[in-house]
Structure formats: structure tokens, C-alpha cells
Amino acid sequence: MMLEHVLVLSSYLLSIGIYGLITSRNMVRALMCLELILNAVNINFVTFSDLFDNRQLKGDIFSIFVIGIAAAEAAIGLAIISAIHRNRKSTRINQSNLLNK
């Protein structure tokens, strides 16, 4: 693939993720949109690592590190969402203000 195609794909993923994060009212959907944003960043890391640094794999290693951090973030986020759902019986963002009660 050419550089422009990969950058357009990454910008689409980033745009969809930011739009979904802003407009989402469900916590699980917001977490999925955050994962889309992180995947767009990973695509850029791998693309520019391949373009500028052919012999060293710094971008690839960094993207694997980001994938690991994103997996931990998703696990912790789902655990928090599960606890909120258990207490509040809802995963809607506007109904989960823990400072009210």
C-alpha cells in the first residue's frame, strides 16, 4: 500500500473513534471508540517505522507496547463498567455520576 492510502485509513479510523467518543452515551461503546483511536495511532507507528527506519523495528515494538497497554486499559475499563452496571443497573454515561448519591 502507498503511504497516502495508509494515512487516509488511519485518519478515517481516528475520525470515527473521536466522533464515537464524543457522541456515545454508552460506556462500552465509548471504550470501543477509544480502542479505534489507539489502533489508528498504531497504524501510523508501523507505517512511519517502515518508511523511515527499515532496519530497526522501533515503531513496531512501540506499537506492540501500545497494544499491550490498550489491552490492560480495556480490561480495567470493562471491570469498572461491570461494577457500575452491578450498582447502578445501567451503563449509560449520563446516568453514572457517582458523586450524586
Curated annotation (Swiss-Prot):
Primary subcellular site in the record, as a coarse category: plastid
EC number: 7.1.1.-
Topology within the bilayer: Multi-pass membrane protein
Coiled coil: none
Classification via Pfam families: Oxidored_q2
GO biological process per UniProt: ATP synthesis coupled electron transport; photosynthesis, light reaction
Location(s) in or outside the cell: Plastid, Chloroplast thylakoid membrane
Statement: the UniProt record of this protein carries the keyword Kinase: no
Keyword terms of this UniProt record: Chloroplast, Membrane, NAD, NADP, Plastid, Plastoquinone, Quinone, Thylakoid, Translocase, Transmembrane, Transmembrane helix, Transport
GO molecular function, one term: quinone binding
The UniProt record lists the keyword Acetylation: no
TM spans (from-to): 2-22, 32-52, 61-81
Catalytic activity of the protein: a plastoquinone + NADH + (n+1) H(+)(in) = a plastoquinol + NAD(+) + n H(+)(out); a plastoquinone + NADPH + (n+1) H(+)(in) = a plastoquinol + NADP(+) + n H(+)(out)
Any GO CC annotation of this UniProt entry: chloroplast thylakoid membrane
NCBIfam families: PRK05715.1-2
Role of this protein: NDH shuttles electrons from NAD(P)H:plastoquinone, via FMN and iron-sulfur (Fe-S) centers, to quinones in the photosynthetic chain and possibly in a chloroplast respiratory chain. The immediate electron acceptor for the enzyme in this species is believed to be plastoquinone. Couples the redox reaction to proton translocation, and thus conserves the redox energy in a proton gradient.
Description of how the protein assembles with itself and partners: NDH is composed of at least 16 different subunits, 5 of which are encoded in the nucleus.
Assigned protein family: Belongs to the complex I subunit 4L family.
Descriptive protein name: NAD(P)H-quinone oxidoreductase subunit 4L, chloroplastic
Gene responsible for this protein: ndhE
